[in-house]
Amino acid sequence: MRKLMILLLFGCGGGSAKYHVDDASLASLSMEEKQGIFAAQNEKNQAQAEFESFKANYRNVDHDVDVADNEYKTAKLQLDTAKMNMKNAEQNADVNRKTSAQRDVQVAELGVKAADAKVDWLKKKRKWIGYSQDAAEKHVAEADARAELEKAKLAQAKGIKPDEKFDPMLFEQDYQEKARKYNDARLDAERLKPDVDGKEREYMTQQQAYDQARSNAMTMQH
C-alpha cells in the first residue's frame, strides 16, 4: 500500500505556480531586467531534473526490495533445512554429522540476519527516496512560483498591468506557501537520511559476519 501510494503521489511529477504573468506583457523589457526570472526558471529546471532522478531511483530500489525479499525467503529456507539436518543427525546419534549440522545452522542463522538487515535497509532507503522525491516535486512548484513572482515584481516596477485582476501580493503569498511546503518536505527527507545510513551499516556488518562464517565453514569442510 505504501509503495502504491508513493507511486500515485509522485507519478504526475513537477508542480506549478497558482498565478501567472503573461510573458507577452514583458516582451518589451530587456534580458538584463529579466535576470531574476531566468534565475528562478533555471532553478526550476534543476529541480525538475532532480525529481526525475529520484523517480528513477525509486523504481530501482523498489526492484531491489523485491529481490531482497526473495533472498530473505531463500535464507529462511536454508536455515529450516539446516535445522532439519541437525535434528536428523541427533536422532541417529551421528556425532560427526551433528557437529557439521550445528555449524550449518549457525551459518544459516547469520545468513537470515544478513538478509533481514538488507530488506530493512532497502525499505528504509525506498522511504527516504520517496520523501526526497516529494521534496524535489515541491521544489519545482516553489521555483515556478518564484519565477512568476519575479515577473509580477518586474511588471509592478515598470508600471505594467498584465490583466485587470493583477495583484503582486497574491504572487508573494503563493510563493511563500510553496516555499514553506518545500522546506518542510526537504527537512522530512533530511531527518530520515541518518537512519538510512545506520541501517546500511547494520546490513554491512551482518553481511560481513555471514560471509566470514560461511568461508570458515567451507575451510573446515576441506
Annotated model-derived regions:
Residues 1-13:
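Sec-dependent bacterial lipoprotein signal peptides
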Residues 168-222:
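C-terminal amphipathic alpha-helix
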Residues 42-77, 81-84, 180, 187, ...:
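Extended alpha-helical stalk/coiled-coil segments
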Residues 5-6, 37, 47, 86, ...:
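Sequence-pattern detector for short linear motifs
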Residues 61-172:
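Extended alpha-helical coiled-coil "stalk/arm" regions
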Residues 31-47:
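N-terminal targeting signals for Sec/Tat export/insertion, comprising classic cleavable signal peptides
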Residues 12-31:
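Bacterial Sec signal peptide processing site at the extreme N-terminus
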